UniProtKB/Swiss-Prot annotation:
Provenance organism: Escherichia coli O9:H4 (strain HS)
Protein name (record): UPF0597 protein YhaM
One Gene Ontology term from the biological process aspect of the record: L-cysteine catabolic process to pyruvate
The encoding gene: yhaM
Family the entry assigns: Belongs to the UPF0597 family.
One Pfam family hit: SDH_alpha
GO molecular function per UniProt: L-cysteine desulfhydrase activity
InterPro entries: Ser_deHydtase-like_asu, UPF0597
Amino acid sequence: MFDSTLNPLWQRYILAVQEEVKPALGCTEPISLALAAAVAAAELEGPVERVEAWVSPNLMKNGLGVTVPGTGMVGLPIAAALGALGGNANAGLEVLKDATAQAIADAKALLAAGKVSVKIQEPCNEILFSRAKVWNGEKWACVTIVGGHTNIVHIETHDGVVFTQQACVAEGEQESPLTVLSRTTLAEILKFVNEVPFAAIRFILDSAKLNCALSQEGLSGKWGLHIGATLEKQCARGLLAKDLSSSIVIRTSAASDARMGGATLPAMSNSGSGNQGITATMPVVVVAEHFGADDERLARALMLSHLSAIYIHNQLPRLSALCAATTAAMGAAAGMAWLVDGRYETISMAISSMIGDVSGMICDGASNSCAMKVSTSASAAWKAVLMALDDTAVTGNEGIVAHDVEQSIANLCALASHSMQQTDRQIIEIMASKAR
């Protein structure tokens, strides 16, 4: 809970972070479907005998190639099956945290028996949509999630409607934290980070705890593309320098390796994405350790990173053709710049250089290769900080970068929200043709 003595704007900032920075076990798109299946199973009379599911094209894109924790299998069907048979309906993005070996075996058996289907919802005007319908004989229960990974909008069974989310806002109800955040600025966020009482933001240290554990697991070399472990080996061979820059990349990518490879450890997510949470966290942690920062400085830097990442991503569709590890890394750049220098000018220059560098990176679905994009984004963030410390940045004379960092962010988000929609359709078409 936040301190009620804080000014109302700061309270909304803290609520925004508490809503958007949460533990998540497994890639959040398959997990969203697993949650829908788990909630449906909880409403069903009797054991689940069959699962049908429908998802948006974007959710299908992010579910085709990612490993579901504990299963050793990729894809949405195993996520739906395990959610239905072993999911914790009350655990949100950690829906699979209590899945037992027996539940995993049962889910695989259900899949092998041809009792699980996942299709693209047609037509579908939602970017993030998942619906799971579970059956026991003629009895059924159906749950629909729209707009957010855990945002359940409808629950229905063979007996009738159980729940429907009301779309209207009650008179006098406060605006959502994200709505308030959309009207703020980076300068106001920095003022908050500098002045808010440490006790009010201490909770953000949990992001370091969770994501550092994931990073350590990734360094075992057992997960995904083991980029972090591979780069660490190359340091030992003398092919890569073991310095601050390489440590940022190694420890950040290792966490993503474990995350995407199916490790049964939660990530602290950001904006509904574990990789975004990792990218907003690990570079800041590594730099903080390098400078011997205490818990308070680390918490302030992490708060700046996570809140800046949320602020930028809030101007984007929830899922798009733009790899959002890049926008999370813009938050990391802000956090690292604050640790080293602390000036608004340095922070804004670092973000502008990031926009001039990695803004064109596409999202071609969640998979082990996400760790490559995470490592690239983390490296670019530190490079942008180093440039800013030398009073150098991509300027408003170049590309989509404007003279003002707020306009630069708006330009990037407009590109992702509008022009890249066709890119997204092309990516989904290519991936669907591979899956056939």
